[in-house]
Design a protein with these regions (language model features):
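M16 family metallopeptidases and their MPP-like homologs
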Residues: 1-24, 42, 53-79, 101-107, ...
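Hydrophobic side chains in well-ordered alpha-helices
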Residues: 16, 115-118, 191, 232, ...
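A common structural junction motif
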Residues: 21-29, 123-130, 238-247, 338-347
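Surface-exposed patches in mature extracellular/periplasmic domains of secreted proteins
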Residues: 28-36, 102, 130-134, 247-252, ...
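Short, conserved secondary-structure transition motifs
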Residues: 41-48, 138-149, 258-267
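An aromatic/glycine/proline-enriched structural segment found at the starts
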Residues: 66-74, 98-99, 103-166, 268, ...
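C-terminal soluble interaction/assembly domains
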Residues: 222, 244, 286-292, 297-312, ...
Length: 395
């Protein structure tokens, strides 16, 4: 993504656009400049390596995506960043920052005619190039995959995920609604009620769909005490199974849809947010009336639409679990997950038979220097061949 924010006064805007185009066309990527950036990132990378959520996300994406481009973190790792050479940046620029890949979103004090003229200036003053090929679809899992990262702490961190679907899937809106019901940020979500309100396992739990060009992820995550780890996973898994199998709660569906409609205007409350929405529409080739018709399309989603979508796209028997904790009995965990699939769901344990001592604030300390992001042999500079992540917008 290339972003430019400038004053709308014609002379200043023209100078800014001219400078941007000059940089795009003629950057030389001097080795000394690259080395300076690499040096500046080392401290940040070190801090990230000591962050359990960072470790969990890297392991999660690599476990699910394998050799796919999405497997590698967009911020890189020490291993991949230090291997970047000027030729890599030049190759990326020449292959992807070209007119055939361009999606231009413009917001600000411009008429439509002025915006069209500006877009034409940008698109005709850079290399035309060739449009990037479509990303391949990743291979979905066929069974449970449990990954454990040893980490000394009283708290354990849990991420449960699976491949989901793409941004252009017709089920997109139904799945967004389903996700709000299952693991939205409010206390009315199913996971929050089961894990926090009823059992006190965690301060917060959330789920999300990541809709991308190739299949993105459905994931849920939370942290809990080490002694509550297996029980909390059991409840989270049972909640997911029950959500897929049982009829949709009509009252919760009504409240969720109303909440989405009320919150939607906040997504374009400033020039920057409007620009982001326009860029999203262009990049994913959404209909031009996407924003104006949003509320109407949400209202039309029925319980049957949501039920069909989650039964199609959620697979509680093919989950990848990444757990950052001091100890984990993987055999016991897998047996518990398999048992959940075979027996009728009754969410247990309940508040009546468990201790709900609040979780103390924990200072996390690694068992040893954490080098997890650099351990995987496939750790290479992020794949750029056939990678279509190259939208360009001007604010």
């Amino acid at each position: 993504v290339v972003r430019l924010r400038t004053l709308s006064e014609p002379q200043k805007m023209q100078s800014a656009v001219k400078m941007m185009l000059e940089i795009l066309k003629n950057s030389t990527f001097e080795r000394s400049n690259i080395q300076r950036v690499q040096s500046n990132t080392q401290i940040g990378q070190k801090q990230l390596q000591e962050n359990p959520s960072r470790l969990m996300n890297i392991r999660l994406y690599r476990a699910i995506y394998g050799q796919h481009a999405y497997a590698e973190p967009i911020t890189g790792t020490n291993g991949s960043i230090n291997r970047i050479q000027p030729a890599h940046l030049q190759q990326f620029r020449d292959r992807f920052l070209v007119a055939q890949n361009m999606n231009i979103a413009i917001t600000g004090k411009l008429t439509l005619k002025e915006a069209e003229k500006l877009a034409n200036t940008i698109s005709t003053h850079i290399a035309q190039g060739v449009a990037a090929t479509t990303l391949p679809q990743p291979t979905p899992a066929t069974r449970f995959n449990i990954q454990h990262i040893p980490y000394r702490s009283q708290q354990a961190h849990v991420s449960i995920a699976q491949l989901a679907t793409t941004r252009d899937d017709p089920d997109y809106l139904a799945l967004e609604i389903a996700n709000k019901m299952l693991g939205g940020s409010s206390f009315n979500s199913i996971l929050m009620k089961e894990l926090r309100v009823k059992r006190g396992y965690t301060y917060g739990v959330s789920s999300t769909f990541r809709f991308t060009q190739a299949a993105g992820l459905f994931s849920l995550g939370y942290s809990t005490r080490q002694d509550q780890l297996l029980d909390s996973i059991q409840v989270a898994h049972q909640s997911l199974i029950q959500f897929v199998q049982q009829p949709i709660n009509l009252e919760q569906l009504k409240e969720t849809k109303a909440g989405l409609i009320r919150a939607f205007p906040n997504q374009y409350s400033s020039n920057a947010s409007i620009n982001a929405q326009l860029g999203h529409i262009g990049f994913y080739r959404l209909p031009v009336n996407y924003l104006s018709d949003y509320a109407e399309r949400v209202e039309k989603i029925t319980a049957e639409d949501v039920q069909r979508a989650i039964r199609k796209h959620l697979q509680p028997d093919r989950l990848t679990l990444v757990i950052v904790s001091e100890h984990l009995d993987k055999a016991a965990l897998e047996k518990m997950l398999q048992d959940n699939l075979l027996t009728p769901i009754s969410l247990t344990p309940t508040l009546r038979n468990m201790k709900t001592t609040p979780i103390d604030k924990i200072t996390l300390a690694p068992m040893q220097e954490v080098v997890e992001p650099d351990l995987v042999p496939s750790d290479v500079p992020a794949l750029i061949l056939d990678n279509a992540h190259n939208e360009s917008d001007v604010d």
